[in-house]
Protein backbone atom coordinates (compact mmCIF):
# COMPACT_ATOMS: atom_id res chain seq x y z
CA UNK A 1 0.00 0.00 0.00
CA UNK A 2 1.39 3.39 -1.00
CA UNK A 3 2.35 6.09 1.50
CA UNK A 4 3.59 9.66 1.26
CA UNK A 5 6.88 10.61 2.92
CA UNK A 6 6.92 14.38 3.36
CA UNK A 7 9.88 16.35 4.63
CA UNK A 8 8.33 19.51 5.97
CA UNK A 9 9.15 23.12 6.64
CA UNK A 10 8.33 24.01 3.03
CA UNK A 11 7.12 27.37 1.75
CA UNK A 12 4.36 26.52 -0.70
CA UNK A 13 4.79 28.77 -3.73
CA UNK A 14 4.58 28.51 -7.50
CA UNK A 15 2.10 27.78 -10.27
CA UNK A 16 -0.22 24.80 -10.68
CA UNK A 17 -2.67 23.91 -13.45
CA UNK A 18 -6.05 22.76 -12.17
CA UNK A 19 -7.66 19.61 -13.56
CA UNK A 20 -11.26 19.00 -14.50
CA UNK A 21 -13.56 18.51 -11.53
CA UNK A 22 -13.98 14.91 -10.45
CA UNK A 23 -17.40 15.69 -9.02
CA UNK A 24 -18.46 17.05 -12.42
CA UNK A 25 -16.73 14.43 -14.58
CA UNK A 26 -18.47 11.47 -12.93
CA UNK A 27 -22.08 12.53 -13.64
CA UNK A 28 -21.06 13.66 -17.13
CA UNK A 29 -19.64 10.19 -17.80
CA UNK A 30 -22.87 8.63 -16.56
CA UNK A 31 -24.88 10.97 -18.79
CA UNK A 32 -23.10 9.56 -21.86
CA UNK A 33 -25.29 6.45 -21.43
CA UNK A 34 -28.28 8.57 -22.46
CA UNK A 35 -26.91 9.41 -25.92
CA UNK A 36 -27.75 7.38 -29.03
CA UNK A 37 -24.73 8.76 -30.92
CA UNK A 38 -21.08 9.09 -29.79
CA UNK A 39 -20.12 11.63 -27.12
CA UNK A 40 -16.72 13.23 -26.51
CA UNK A 41 -15.79 14.68 -23.13
CA UNK A 42 -12.66 16.82 -22.61
CA UNK A 43 -10.75 17.96 -19.50
CA UNK A 44 -11.46 14.63 -17.76
CA UNK A 45 -9.06 14.06 -14.84
CA UNK A 46 -7.00 10.87 -14.57
CA UNK A 47 -8.27 9.63 -11.22
CA UNK A 48 -9.14 6.26 -9.74
CA UNK A 49 -12.85 7.11 -9.47
CA UNK A 50 -12.92 8.10 -13.14
CA UNK A 51 -11.17 4.88 -14.15
CA UNK A 52 -13.62 2.88 -12.05
CA UNK A 53 -16.67 4.47 -13.67
CA UNK A 54 -15.21 4.00 -17.15
CA UNK A 55 -14.64 0.33 -16.33
CA UNK A 56 -18.19 0.03 -14.99
CA UNK A 57 -19.69 1.60 -18.13
CA UNK A 58 -17.47 -0.53 -20.36
CA UNK A 59 -18.67 -3.62 -18.52
CA UNK A 60 -22.12 -2.97 -19.95
CA UNK A 61 -20.76 -3.56 -23.44
CA UNK A 62 -20.48 0.16 -24.17
CA UNK A 63 -17.45 1.26 -26.18
CA UNK A 64 -15.73 3.82 -23.97
CA UNK A 65 -12.08 4.83 -23.94
CA UNK A 66 -9.85 7.52 -22.47
CA UNK A 67 -6.87 9.10 -24.21
CA UNK A 68 -5.15 11.85 -22.28
CA UNK A 69 -7.88 14.02 -20.81
CA UNK A 70 -10.46 13.05 -23.47
CA UNK A 71 -13.09 10.31 -23.15
CA UNK A 72 -15.14 9.05 -26.08
CA UNK A 73 -18.23 6.91 -25.66
CA UNK A 74 -20.48 5.01 -28.09
CA UNK A 75 -23.44 3.21 -26.52
CA UNK A 76 -24.61 1.27 -29.59
CA UNK A 77 -23.08 -1.99 -28.35
CA UNK A 78 -24.60 -1.98 -24.83
CA UNK A 79 -25.65 -5.52 -23.88
CA UNK A 80 -26.53 -5.33 -20.16
CA UNK A 81 -27.79 -2.86 -17.57
CA UNK A 82 -25.86 -4.16 -14.56
CA UNK A 83 -23.47 -2.36 -12.18
CA UNK A 84 -21.68 -4.95 -9.99
CA UNK A 85 -20.78 -4.57 -6.33
CA UNK A 86 -17.06 -5.12 -6.98
CA UNK A 87 -16.90 -1.77 -8.79
CA UNK A 88 -19.69 0.20 -7.11
CA UNK A 89 -18.40 -0.56 -3.59
CA UNK A 90 -15.38 1.70 -4.09
CA UNK A 91 -17.26 4.77 -5.30
CA UNK A 92 -20.60 6.33 -4.44
CA UNK A 93 -20.99 8.04 -7.81
CA UNK A 94 -21.61 4.67 -9.45
CA UNK A 95 -25.26 5.03 -8.42
CA UNK A 96 -25.49 7.77 -11.07
CA UNK A 97 -25.78 5.15 -13.82
CA UNK A 98 -29.18 4.15 -12.40
CA UNK A 99 -31.11 7.12 -13.78
CA UNK A 100 -29.69 6.97 -17.32
CA UNK A 101 -30.16 3.19 -17.61
CA UNK A 102 -33.69 3.33 -16.28
CA UNK A 103 -34.68 6.27 -18.48
CA UNK A 104 -33.22 5.01 -21.75
CA UNK A 105 -33.55 1.24 -21.47
CA UNK A 106 -36.35 0.85 -18.94
CA UNK A 107 -34.41 -1.30 -16.48
CA UNK A 108 -31.31 -1.35 -14.29
CA UNK A 109 -29.67 -3.41 -11.57
CA UNK A 110 -27.15 -1.37 -9.61
CA UNK A 111 -25.35 -2.25 -6.40
CA UNK A 112 -25.80 0.09 -3.47
CA UNK A 113 -22.78 2.40 -3.38
CA UNK A 114 -19.57 2.69 -1.35
CA UNK A 115 -16.91 5.43 -1.29
CA UNK A 116 -15.73 7.64 1.57
CA UNK A 117 -16.95 6.61 5.02
CA UNK A 118 -18.14 10.09 6.03
CA UNK A 119 -21.73 9.42 6.92
CA UNK A 120 -24.66 7.45 5.63
CA UNK A 121 -25.40 9.67 2.62
CA UNK A 122 -28.46 7.57 1.76
CA UNK A 123 -29.76 7.14 -1.79
CA UNK A 124 -33.39 7.07 -0.69
CA UNK A 125 -34.07 10.44 -2.33
CA UNK A 126 -32.99 9.03 -5.71
CA UNK A 127 -35.28 6.03 -5.31
CA UNK A 128 -38.28 8.04 -4.09
CA UNK A 129 -38.04 10.28 -7.14
CA UNK A 130 -37.85 7.32 -9.53
CA UNK A 131 -40.90 5.79 -7.86
CA UNK A 132 -42.72 9.10 -8.32
CA UNK A 133 -41.87 8.75 -12.03
CA UNK A 134 -43.62 5.38 -12.11
CA UNK A 135 -40.65 3.06 -11.65
CA UNK A 136 -40.84 -0.16 -9.68
CA UNK A 137 -37.96 -0.22 -7.18
CA UNK A 138 -36.86 -3.15 -5.04
CA UNK A 139 -33.68 -3.64 -3.04
CA UNK A 140 -32.48 -7.24 -2.93
CA UNK A 141 -29.15 -8.60 -1.68
CA UNK A 142 -27.58 -5.15 -1.75
CA UNK A 143 -28.76 -4.30 -5.27
CA UNK A 144 -31.29 -1.74 -6.47
CA UNK A 145 -33.49 -3.41 -9.10
CA UNK A 146 -35.42 -0.81 -11.08
CA UNK A 147 -38.04 -1.26 -13.78
CA UNK A 148 -39.77 1.47 -15.77
CA UNK A 149 -43.58 1.41 -15.93
CA UNK A 150 -45.44 -0.41 -18.69
CA UNK A 151 -44.32 0.94 -22.03
CA UNK A 152 -40.71 1.28 -20.88
CA UNK A 153 -40.79 5.04 -20.26
CA UNK A 154 -40.54 6.93 -17.00
CA UNK A 155 -43.32 9.45 -16.50
CA UNK A 156 -42.82 13.13 -15.82
CA UNK A 157 -43.93 14.23 -12.36
CA UNK A 158 -43.71 16.96 -9.77
CA UNK A 159 -41.22 16.04 -7.05
CA UNK A 160 -39.46 17.96 -4.30
CA UNK A 161 -36.42 16.52 -2.55
CA UNK A 162 -36.77 16.20 1.23
CA UNK A 163 -33.22 17.51 1.57
CA UNK A 164 -30.67 19.07 -0.73
CA UNK A 165 -28.89 16.22 -2.50
CA UNK A 166 -26.30 16.72 -5.23
CA UNK A 167 -26.28 13.11 -6.42
CA UNK A 168 -30.05 12.86 -6.21
CA UNK A 169 -30.53 16.01 -8.28
CA UNK A 170 -28.08 14.75 -10.89
CA UNK A 171 -29.58 11.27 -11.12
CA UNK A 172 -33.14 12.53 -11.47
CA UNK A 173 -32.51 15.26 -14.06
CA UNK A 174 -30.75 12.67 -16.22
CA UNK A 175 -33.72 10.34 -15.92
CA UNK A 176 -36.25 13.13 -16.49
CA UNK A 177 -34.53 14.17 -19.72
CA UNK A 178 -35.96 11.06 -21.45
CA UNK A 179 -39.18 10.72 -19.46
CA UNK A 180 -42.61 11.00 -21.04
CA UNK A 181 -43.98 14.40 -20.11
CA UNK A 182 -42.69 17.21 -17.94
CA UNK A 183 -40.88 16.87 -14.61
CA UNK A 184 -40.72 19.72 -12.11
CA UNK A 185 -38.03 19.20 -9.46
CA UNK A 186 -38.01 21.24 -6.26
CA UNK A 187 -35.27 21.79 -3.67
CA UNK A 188 -32.58 21.00 -6.26
CA UNK A 189 -28.90 21.25 -5.42
CA UNK A 190 -27.25 24.41 -6.77
CA UNK A 191 -23.65 23.15 -6.97
CA UNK A 192 -21.61 24.13 -10.07
CA UNK A 193 -21.25 20.45 -10.92
CA UNK A 194 -25.06 20.12 -11.14
CA UNK A 195 -25.15 23.15 -13.44
CA UNK A 196 -22.39 21.61 -15.56
CA UNK A 197 -24.40 18.40 -15.97
CA UNK A 198 -27.57 20.27 -16.90
CA UNK A 199 -25.67 22.28 -19.50
CA UNK A 200 -24.25 19.10 -21.04
CA UNK A 201 -27.71 17.53 -21.14
CA UNK A 202 -28.97 20.61 -23.01
CA UNK A 203 -26.08 20.20 -25.46
CA UNK A 204 -27.32 16.62 -25.97
CA UNK A 205 -30.82 17.85 -26.82
CA UNK A 206 -32.51 17.94 -23.41
CA UNK A 207 -35.04 20.66 -22.59
CA UNK A 208 -34.27 22.05 -19.14
CA UNK A 209 -35.20 25.40 -17.62
CA UNK A 210 -34.29 26.84 -14.24
CA UNK A 211 -30.67 25.64 -14.41
CA UNK A 212 -28.77 26.93 -11.38
CA UNK A 213 -31.95 27.48 -9.35
CA UNK A 214 -33.71 25.37 -6.74
CA UNK A 215 -36.55 24.51 -9.15
CA UNK A 216 -35.78 22.89 -12.48
CA UNK A 217 -38.29 21.96 -15.15
CA UNK A 218 -37.36 19.17 -17.53
CA UNK A 219 -39.50 18.51 -20.59
CA UNK A 220 -38.82 14.95 -21.64
CA UNK A 221 -37.67 14.26 -25.21
CA UNK A 222 -37.75 11.09 -27.30
CA UNK A 223 -33.99 10.75 -27.66
CA UNK A 224 -30.71 12.45 -26.84
CA UNK A 225 -27.72 12.72 -29.15
CA UNK A 226 -24.02 12.82 -28.41
CA UNK A 227 -22.09 16.06 -28.07
CA UNK A 228 -18.62 17.46 -27.42
CA UNK A 229 -18.21 19.00 -23.99
CA UNK A 230 -15.52 20.01 -21.47
CA UNK A 231 -15.59 19.34 -17.72
CA UNK A 232 -15.69 22.41 -15.47
CA UNK A 233 -12.46 23.12 -13.48
CA UNK A 234 -12.14 21.52 -10.04
CA UNK A 235 -13.00 24.19 -7.46
CA UNK A 236 -11.98 21.93 -4.55
CA UNK A 237 -8.56 21.15 -6.03
CA UNK A 238 -8.16 24.88 -6.62
CA UNK A 239 -8.99 25.72 -3.02
CA UNK A 240 -6.76 22.95 -1.69
CA UNK A 241 -3.61 24.28 -3.37
CA UNK A 242 -4.42 27.89 -2.52
CA UNK A 243 -4.78 26.79 1.11
CA UNK A 244 -1.12 25.80 1.08
CA UNK A 245 -0.13 29.42 0.52
CA UNK A 246 -2.06 30.54 3.61
CA UNK A 247 -0.30 27.96 5.79
CA UNK A 248 3.26 28.82 4.78
CA UNK A 249 3.48 32.57 4.02
CA UNK A 250 3.31 31.30 0.46
CA UNK A 251 2.32 32.51 -2.99
CA UNK A 252 0.30 30.14 -5.20
CA UNK A 253 -1.09 30.80 -8.67
CA UNK A 254 -3.75 28.35 -9.86
CA UNK A 255 -4.41 28.28 -13.62
CA UNK A 256 -7.26 26.81 -15.71
CA UNK A 257 -9.78 27.60 -12.98
CA UNK A 258 -12.53 30.07 -12.15
CA UNK A 259 -12.97 32.36 -9.15
CA UNK A 260 -16.73 32.31 -9.74
CA UNK A 261 -16.78 28.67 -8.64
CA UNK A 262 -15.04 29.38 -5.34
CA UNK A 263 -16.48 32.66 -4.03
CA UNK A 264 -17.32 31.56 -0.44
CA UNK A 265 -13.87 29.99 0.03
CA UNK A 266 -11.97 32.97 -1.38
CA UNK A 267 -13.93 35.28 0.93
CA UNK A 268 -12.83 33.19 3.94
CA UNK A 269 -9.23 33.20 2.70
CA UNK A 270 -9.36 37.00 2.63
CA UNK A 271 -10.85 37.02 6.14
CA UNK A 272 -7.81 34.97 7.21
CA UNK A 273 -5.47 37.62 5.82
CA UNK A 274 -4.67 36.36 2.33
CA UNK A 275 -4.28 38.66 -0.65
CA UNK A 276 -6.48 37.18 -3.39
CA UNK A 277 -6.23 38.32 -7.00
CA UNK A 278 -8.15 36.77 -9.89
CA UNK A 279 -8.45 36.75 -13.67
CA UNK A 280 -10.73 35.05 -16.15
CA UNK A 281 -9.03 31.67 -15.68
CA UNK A 282 -6.65 32.07 -12.74
CA UNK A 283 -6.57 32.74 -8.99
CA UNK A 284 -3.57 33.83 -6.93
CA UNK A 285 -3.25 33.65 -3.14
CA UNK A 286 -0.44 35.44 -1.27
CA UNK A 287 0.09 35.31 2.47
CA UNK A 288 2.51 37.60 4.27
CA UNK A 289 1.77 36.91 7.94
CA UNK A 290 0.16 34.45 10.28
CA UNK A 291 -3.44 33.50 9.38
CA UNK A 292 -6.27 35.05 11.35
CA UNK A 293 -8.84 32.91 13.14
CA UNK A 294 -12.13 32.44 11.32
CA UNK A 295 -15.51 30.80 11.85
CA UNK A 296 -16.73 28.28 9.26
CA UNK A 297 -20.22 26.90 8.82
CA UNK A 298 -20.57 24.42 5.95
CA UNK A 299 -23.68 24.78 3.81
CA UNK A 300 -24.96 23.61 0.44
CA UNK A 301 -23.85 25.79 -2.46
CA UNK A 302 -23.61 28.78 -2.60
CA UNK A 303 -22.53 28.45 1.04
CA UNK A 304 -19.14 27.24 2.26
CA UNK A 305 -18.46 23.78 0.76
CA UNK A 306 -18.02 20.83 3.09
CA UNK A 307 -15.28 19.53 0.78
CA UNK A 308 -13.06 22.48 1.85
CA UNK A 309 -13.71 22.15 5.58
CA UNK A 310 -10.67 19.97 6.36
CA UNK A 311 -8.23 22.08 4.35
CA UNK A 312 -9.34 25.34 5.96
CA UNK A 313 -9.22 23.68 9.37
CA UNK A 314 -5.55 22.90 8.71
CA UNK A 315 -4.97 26.62 8.10
CA UNK A 316 -6.91 27.51 11.25
CA UNK A 317 -4.62 25.23 13.26
CA UNK A 318 -1.84 27.77 12.63
CA UNK A 319 -4.01 30.87 13.04
CA UNK A 320 -3.67 33.59 15.64
CA UNK A 321 -6.70 32.93 17.83
CA UNK A 322 -9.52 30.42 18.10
CA UNK A 323 -11.65 29.29 15.15
CA UNK A 324 -15.00 27.51 15.26
CA UNK A 325 -16.21 25.04 12.62
CA UNK A 326 -19.78 23.79 12.31
CA UNK A 327 -20.32 20.88 9.90
CA UNK A 328 -23.90 20.91 8.61
CA UNK A 329 -23.65 18.56 5.62
CA UNK A 330 -22.24 15.19 6.72
CA UNK A 331 -21.85 13.38 10.00
CA UNK A 332 -18.45 11.83 10.77
CA UNK A 333 -16.64 14.53 8.82
CA UNK A 334 -14.15 15.34 11.56
CA UNK A 335 -12.16 12.13 11.20
CA UNK A 336 -9.09 14.19 10.26
CA UNK A 337 -9.11 15.92 13.66
CA UNK A 338 -7.22 13.21 15.62
CA UNK A 339 -4.61 13.11 12.85
CA UNK A 340 -4.14 16.88 12.82
CA UNK A 341 -3.82 16.73 16.60
CA UNK A 342 -1.06 14.14 16.17
CA UNK A 343 0.74 16.77 14.10
CA UNK A 344 0.51 19.21 17.01
CA UNK A 345 -2.85 20.89 16.43
CA UNK A 346 -5.22 21.77 19.28
CA UNK A 347 -8.75 20.81 18.20
CA UNK A 348 -11.73 19.71 20.27
CA UNK A 349 -14.89 18.27 18.75
CA UNK A 350 -18.38 18.28 20.25
CA UNK A 351 -20.96 16.86 17.87
CA UNK A 352 -21.07 18.97 14.70
CA UNK A 353 -18.80 21.65 16.19
CA UNK A 354 -15.00 21.76 16.23
CA UNK A 355 -13.06 24.40 18.16
CA UNK A 356 -9.55 25.05 16.85
CA UNK A 357 -7.01 26.89 19.00
CA UNK A 358 -4.18 28.14 16.85
CA UNK A 359 -0.65 26.88 17.51
CA UNK A 360 2.68 28.25 16.32
CA UNK A 361 3.58 25.29 14.12
CA UNK A 362 2.90 21.66 13.24
CA UNK A 363 5.31 18.91 14.28
CA UNK A 364 6.11 15.90 12.12
CA UNK A 365 4.39 12.60 12.92
CA UNK A 366 3.04 9.47 11.22
CA UNK A 367 -0.64 9.95 10.34
CA UNK A 368 -3.40 8.14 8.48
CA UNK A 369 -5.67 9.56 5.79
CA UNK A 370 -9.33 8.84 6.56
CA UNK A 371 -11.11 10.24 3.50
CA UNK A 372 -10.42 12.17 0.32
CA UNK A 373 -10.41 15.77 1.53
CA UNK A 374 -8.96 14.93 4.95
CA UNK A 375 -5.96 13.42 3.20
CA UNK A 376 -5.14 16.73 1.52
CA UNK A 377 -5.36 18.61 4.82
CA UNK A 378 -2.80 16.20 6.28
CA UNK A 379 -0.48 16.60 3.29
CA UNK A 380 -0.54 20.38 3.62
CA UNK A 381 -0.03 20.21 7.38
CA UNK A 382 2.88 17.79 7.01
CA UNK A 383 4.45 20.08 4.41
CA UNK A 384 4.70 22.84 7.03
CA UNK A 385 5.93 20.61 9.87
CA UNK A 386 9.59 20.39 10.84
CA UNK A 387 10.87 16.88 10.09
CA UNK A 388 9.55 13.84 8.24
CA UNK A 389 5.90 12.77 8.28
CA UNK A 390 4.58 9.51 6.88
CA UNK A 391 0.99 9.56 5.59
CA UNK A 392 -0.69 6.18 5.28
CA UNK A 393 -3.71 5.10 3.19
CA UNK A 394 -3.12 7.70 0.50
CA UNK A 395 -5.35 5.82 -1.92
CA UNK A 396 -7.95 8.28 -0.66
CA UNK A 397 -6.06 11.22 -2.18
CA UNK A 398 -5.61 9.37 -5.48
CA UNK A 399 -9.41 9.32 -5.78
CA UNK A 400 -9.64 13.09 -6.04
CA UNK A 401 -6.34 14.77 -6.92
CA UNK A 402 -4.70 14.23 -10.32
CA UNK A 403 -0.87 14.06 -10.48
CA UNK A 404 -0.79 15.24 -6.89
CA UNK A 405 2.92 14.65 -6.20
CA UNK A 406 3.99 16.45 -9.39
CA UNK A 407 1.81 19.44 -8.59
CA UNK A 408 2.97 19.60 -4.97
CA UNK A 409 6.63 19.37 -5.99
CA UNK A 410 6.06 22.25 -8.41
CA UNK A 411 4.91 24.24 -5.37
CA UNK A 412 8.03 23.38 -3.39
CA UNK A 413 6.79 20.46 -1.30
CA UNK A 414 9.35 17.72 -0.59
CA UNK A 415 7.12 14.69 -1.16
CA UNK A 416 7.87 11.10 -2.11
CA UNK A 417 5.50 8.21 -2.80
CA UNK A 418 6.74 4.99 -1.27
CA UNK A 419 5.33 1.49 -1.11
CA UNK A 420 5.04 0.15 2.42
CA UNK A 421 5.86 -3.31 1.09
CA UNK A 422 9.23 -2.16 -0.20
From Swiss-Prot:
Its EC number is 2.5.1.7. Pathway: Cell wall biogenesis; peptidoglycan biosynthesis. GO terms for biological process: cell division; cell wall organization; peptidoglycan biosynthetic process; regulation of cell shape; UDP-N-acetylgalactosamine biosynthetic process. It holds the Pfam family EPSP_synthase. Phosphoenolpyruvate binds at residues 22-23. The modification 2-(S-cysteinyl)pyruvic acid O-phosphothioketal is found at residue 116. UDP-N-acetyl-alpha-D-glucosamine binds at residues 92, 121-125, 307, 329. It comes from the Bacteria. It is found in: Cytoplasm. The keyword Cell cycle applies. CDD domains: UdpNAET (cd01555). The active site is at 116 (proton donor). Keywords: Cell cycle, Cell division, Cell shape, Cell wall biogenesis/degradation, Cytoplasm, Peptidoglycan synthesis, Pyruvate, Transferase. Its main location: cytoplasm. It catalyses: phosphoenolpyruvate + UDP-N-acetyl-alpha-D-glucosamine = UDP-N-acetyl-3-O-(1-carboxyvinyl)-alpha-D-glucosamine + phosphate. It is an enzyme of class 2 (transferase). Cell wall formation. Adds enolpyruvyl to UDP-N-acetylglucosamine. Belongs to the EPSP synthase family. MurA subfamily. HAMAP family: MurA. This is UDP-N-acetylglucosamine 1-carboxyvinyltransferase. It comes from Psychrobacter cryohalolentis (strain ATCC BAA-1226 / DSM 17306 / VKM B-2378 / K5). The gene is murA.
Amino acid sequence: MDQFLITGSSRIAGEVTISGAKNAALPLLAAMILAETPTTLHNVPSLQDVRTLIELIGGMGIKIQKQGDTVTCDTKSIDNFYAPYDLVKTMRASILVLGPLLARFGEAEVSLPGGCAIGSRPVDQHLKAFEAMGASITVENGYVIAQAPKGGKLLGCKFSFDMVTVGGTENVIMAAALAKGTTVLGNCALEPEVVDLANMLVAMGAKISGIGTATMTIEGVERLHGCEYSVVPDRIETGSYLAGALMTHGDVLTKNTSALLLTPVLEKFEDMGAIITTGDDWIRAQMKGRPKAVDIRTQPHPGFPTDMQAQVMAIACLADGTSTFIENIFENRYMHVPELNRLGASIQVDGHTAVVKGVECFTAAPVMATDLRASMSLVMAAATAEGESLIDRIYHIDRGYEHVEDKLRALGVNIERINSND
